[in-house]
């Protein structure tokens, strides 16, 4: 059994893999619009961004919902034969990705691999007219992933 010692602490100043904050939790669901409606009306989350057929996304719909410092992403596939569709059919609605804000995506990616993590997406930058985002992903438990942002 794993035992954690109270005196065994990672020194923040020396650990290059320090997580600064949680960025988001992404749920893969059967109906993103319905899930967004629920989170807005039942739990008080506000929609802050979306991607769907209306924005040119022909693979899936996603809604970013925010309340205070909490940010969730609700995504649903248009096709059951896609990766997202197959995952949703197998597992039902649930968490797919946990986004972690780190100081340096490249360093966090490399250090996680050095510590035994399985890399999925190497450091990648995406951008559009609204800005850019650098991220990398690693495999964790089951089919859930962690995304360094």
Task: Label each region the model flagged.
Residues 134-149:
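C-terminal catalytic ATP-binding subdomain
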Residues 1-10, 63-81, 145-149:
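Conserved oxyanion/phosphate-binding beta-strand-loop segments in alpha/beta enzyme cores
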């Amino acid at each position: 059994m794993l035992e954690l010692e109270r005196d065994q602490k990672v020194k923040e100043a020396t650990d290059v893999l320090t997580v600064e904050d949680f960025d988001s939790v992404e749920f893969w669901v059967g109906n993103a619009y319905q899930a967004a409606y629920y989170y807005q009306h039942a739990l008080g989350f506000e929609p802050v961004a979306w991607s769907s057929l209306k924005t040119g996304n022909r693979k899936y719909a996603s809604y970013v919902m925010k309340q205070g410092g909490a940010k969730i992403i609700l995504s649903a596939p248009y096709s059951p034969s896609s990766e997202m569709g197959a995952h949703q059919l197998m597992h039902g609605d649930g968490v797919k990705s946990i986004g972690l804000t780190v100081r340096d995506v490249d360093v966090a990616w490399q250090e996680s691999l050095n510590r035994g993590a399985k890399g999925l997406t190497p450091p990648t930058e995406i951008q559009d007219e609204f800005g850019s985002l650098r991220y990398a992903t690693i495999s964790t438990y089951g089919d859930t992933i962690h995304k360094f942002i």
